[in-house]
């Protein structure tokens, strides 16, 4: 003989609960439902406006620290290699030109690389393989492997084996011996 009320939550599922809530329970439930809906909406936000394909919901370094690449050195403070060593980061460029890699470049998980932030003519990575981590957003880079280093390792421009959640956007890959990307 309790008065029941019908509550409908519209998310991806239409969940209907037939429950009597006290005023405090209503506040708690409403707050928790709003948090869950917000989290679900954020998780489904595209990697960037117009992102399509399998990686369209990758989060990359979203919400992480913004790190500026301030030189074209292969390593050290301000270098691209230093910037991608650990995640959760968003990488932006204050410089443009060619970064002559001296070894394979391993990108940590949970990284967003915004190559479009570089001045003209943009950023080119040369000589060695780029190895993205999982949950990476990589935009507006040129990757040019080449044979100059005389290394017979298959010479892929990128290598993503056993990684998940990677999206490349407006990137170009060339001068590889085996697969390009």
Predicted regions and their residues:
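Short, solvent-exposed beta-strand edge segments and adjacent coil->beta transition regions
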Residues: 64-66, 153-155, 178
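Active-site-proximal beta-strand/loop segments in catalytic clefts of secreted hydrolases
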Residues: 72, 94-96, 116, 176
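Active-site cradle of extracellular carbohydrate-active enzymes
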Residues: 171-172, 177-181
């Amino acid at each position: 003989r309790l008065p029941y009320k019908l509550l409908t939550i519209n998310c991806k599922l239409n969940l209907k609960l037939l429950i009597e809530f006290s005023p405090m329970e209503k506040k708690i439930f409403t707050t928790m439902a709003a948090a869950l809906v917000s989290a679900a909406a954020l998780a489904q936000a595209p990697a960037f406006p117009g992102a399509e394909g399998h990686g369209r919901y990758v989060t990359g370094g979203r919400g992480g620290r913004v790190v500026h690449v301030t030189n074209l050195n292969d390593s050290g403070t301000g270098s691209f290699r230093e910037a991608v060593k650990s995640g959760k980061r968003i990488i932006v460029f204050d410089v443009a030109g060619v970064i002559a890699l001296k070894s394979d470049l391993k990108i940590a998980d949970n990284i967003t690389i915004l190559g479009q932030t570089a001045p003209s003519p943009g950023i080119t990575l040369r000589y060695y393989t780029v190895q993205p981590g999982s949950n990476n957003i990589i935009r507006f880079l040129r990757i040019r492997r080449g044979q100059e280093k005389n290394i017979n390792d298959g010479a892929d421009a990128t290598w993503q084996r056993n990684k998940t959640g990677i999206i490349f956007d407006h990137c170009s890959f060339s001068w590889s011996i085996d697969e390009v990307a």
